[in-house]
Design a protein with these regions (language model features):
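Membrane-proximal helical "anchor" segments flanking the first transmembrane region
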Residues: 1-60, 67
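Alpha-helical segments flanking ligand/cofactor-binding loops in enzyme cores
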Residues: 50, 74, 126, 165-166
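Short acidic active-site motifs
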Residues: 48, 120-125
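Flexible, active-site-adjacent loop/turn segments at secondary-structure boundaries
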Residues: 39-41, 47, 64, 148-152, ...
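Membrane-associated lipid acylation/remodeling enzymes share a hydrophobic transmembrane-juxtamembrane segment
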Residues: 81-84, 127-182
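Catalytic core of membrane glycerolipid acyltransferases/transacylases, capturing the structured
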Residues: 6-9, 13-16, 55-116, 131, ...
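Short, flexible segments with low predicted structural confidence
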Residues: 23-24, 100, 139-140
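Short, conserved clusters of charged catalytic residues that mark active-site
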Residues: 44, 120-121, 159-163
Length: 182
């Protein structure tokens, strides 16, 4: 209704959404099964992205809950030892259990859980960035609205977290936006 679509068009859009979500789940299983070489990859601004990753400095990477981040695993294999994923503590344990239970090899990333001790998480992020590592966030998820900014996004107002950019600015590291889609 928010998009002003009729009933039939809304049903079609919902079906397409579920279809793409199903493809994403299949991609996740395929990546965990070691089939990443069966996929073809296409990148936007690939040379600039590699230039930033190879610079030796820390990088803040911002993704979204869209597509399948595991689809990028083939690309990030060489860079994986330097990846730190920042996530909510409750999700951390659930995701850790799923990944460790299904992974065919050892994980190639570190998780920085956000919990009641936000200072500890911030210090871990600072250490990682100072060591030339990458910290990855999902930019479409935040707690509360105190540290957000309201901007126009795809024709509507949307809240986005400011903290990700503040961390990058304070640590003087570049920000890279990343997503992978089928």
């Amino acid at each position: 209704r928010k998009r002003g679509l009729g009933v039939l068009r809304s049903i079609k859009e919902l079906y397409c959404h579920y279809f793409v979500f199903g493809q994403t789940l299949i991609d996740k299983v395929a990546m965990k099964a070691g089939l990443e070489k069966q996929y073809n990859y296409q990148f936007d601004n690939y040379e600039r992205f590699l230039e930033i990753l190879n610079s030796g400095q820390g990088v803040v990477m911002i993704g979204a809950h869209v597509g399948c981040w595991e689809a990028g695993a083939g690309f990030f294999g060489a860079y994986g030892k330097k990846i730190n994923i920042v996530m909510l503590d409750a999700e951390h344990q659930q995701i850790k259990d799923v990944i460790e239970g299904n992974a065919k090899e050892e994980k190639n990333y570190n998780v920085i859980p956000l919990n009641q001790n936000i200072i500890d998480a911030m210090l871990q992020m600072k250490v990682a960035l100072n060591n030339g590592e990458y910290i990855c966030f999902t930019g479409d998820r935040f707690i509360g609205t105190d540290n957000t900014i309201l901007i126009d996004f795809l024709g509507s107002k949307a809240l986005f977290p400011k903290g990700l950019f503040q961390i990058a600015a304070k640590c003087r590291v570049p920000v890279v936006f990343y997503y992978s889609m089928r």
